[in-house]
Amino acid sequence: MDIFLAILPAIFWGSIVLFNVKLGGGPYSQTLGTTFGALIFSIVVYIFMKPVLTPTVIGVGIVSGLFWALGQANQLKSIDLMGVSRTMPISTGLQLVATTLFGVIVFHEWSTTISVVLGVLALVCIIIGVILTSLQSEEEKNAEQAGNFKRGIIILLISTVGYLVYVVVIRLFNVDGWSALLPQAVGMVLGGILLTFKHHPFNKYAIRNIIPGLIWAAGNMFLFISQPRVGVATSFSLSQMGIIISTLGGILILGERKTKRQLTGIVVGIVFIIAAGIMLGIAKS
């Protein structure tokens, strides 16, 4: 039962972008709707959990949420250019590299020889995985498609910065996840509005995309529940499995076309990235 709870965040988070794309509306309406969904869920959780909200918790939570919105909005922009099945493995890989290097440099996480070896191997696996999942078909090598890929990668780098700050600012100030949940959601909504209001995102698609926001917040809740039961290392490793759902879902559910060579690269690349996530989880423990 505990392992099942620990897998739920991966299932929920892995399906979010599939819902975003299926529900439609483009990256701006998708971002805004998702943030409002997260806020609704967080208000309900706050009513039942009643965590203590200090000025530090509120401030840190809002900043974290603002940067989450930056990460999510740019990830959805990249999906608009490159598709789910290409964007998500690269995005996951970049996030793992960024959070790992920050953890090593700032928090000195790799304190033993084994953790250093596992960490370095994990980073190598991530690089290999990202390269394999980025393979282009001959058709995609034309000027327009190549331009979309380059723009998509640049946008993903911005997205990675957003997701990195979203994660590490909570840890830097040692804020409890349950306490940060509501302020975080407020920051997400503020960030979503600031990043999208020029593009007139307030439409029926924004309302539809409240659903992915509810799903994201539910995944967050199950992560908080599972961590004390299975440990941070195991829950972190299992949460990376969402890449399987999002990537294969992009191909099988959204109908993104891939050549046999690309499919092979994606499957093998996912294996490398998941292996890296597991190794990083062990290195953290």
From Swiss-Prot:
A single MF term (Gene Ontology): carbohydrate transmembrane transporter activity
Membrane topology: Multi-pass membrane protein
CDD domains hit by this protein: glucose_uptake_GlcU (cd23112)
Gene name as annotated: glcU
Leader peptide range in chain numbering: none
The UniProt record lists the keyword Cell membrane: yes
Assigned protein family: Belongs to the GRP transporter (TC 2.A.7.5) family.
Organism: Bacillus cereus (strain ATCC 10987 / NRS 248)
Matching PANTHER family: TRANSMEMBRANE PROTEIN 144
Cellular compartments annotated: Cell membrane
Keywords (A to Z) from UniProt: Cell membrane, Membrane, Sugar transport, Transmembrane, Transmembrane helix, Transport
GO cellular component: plasma membrane
Disulfide bonds: none
Transmembrane feature ranges: 4-21, 26-48, 52-71, 84-106, 110-132, 153-175, 180-197, 210-227, 232-254, 266-283
Role noted for this protein: Involved in the uptake of glucose.
Main location (coarse class): membrane
Name of the protein: Probable glucose uptake protein GlcU
